[in-house]
């Protein structure tokens, strides 16, 4: 039987920081999932959180990394994307980037009427004083297709059908790890340089 790879997924697109680890050294090799309500303190706790889950002396054994690329808080998203890119570059390790909306799409689609499932739908989020951010998705045969990356929609736009963003970092970081495991098994290249954070609005406000 082929040995399981050592894989790590990071998600910080909300006030909670999520990590998921597939570690072949763990009994049963079930994924380890942790969620910490670090909020703005993530800038001080990020590295120590990762080190506590996976000691630095084992980082060179990583065979794949994944990170949620946003939308989310500017600082939190940027921190984990930068850390994941740096690790992937230094370790020559594949890096998968997935938007936070794409991660929640499978569970949000279940809120739609049965007749609409399998068809394109929108995930939207209203931001105070900014507007509505939306991305379009379609799920076929268990695969999430991101038809439109999350972006700030034109004022007054109301795409349908639409489901409001609902945060569940524990479920979504576990989904991210599952996607990483699937991509690793398929031999996907996953170059780190292509993974960038998604900022639908300017972090410095209106210009």
Task: Pin down the residues of each PLM region.
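Short, conserved active-site loops that position catalytic residues or coordinate cofactors/metal ions
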Residues: 48-49, 79
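Short, well-ordered alpha-helices that flank and scaffold nucleotide-derived cofactor binding pockets
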Residues: 52, 85, 89, 110-111, ...
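Catalytic-core segment of enzymes that process non-peptidic bonds
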Residues: 34
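Oxyanion-binding and handling regions
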Residues: 1-30, 39-45, 96-207
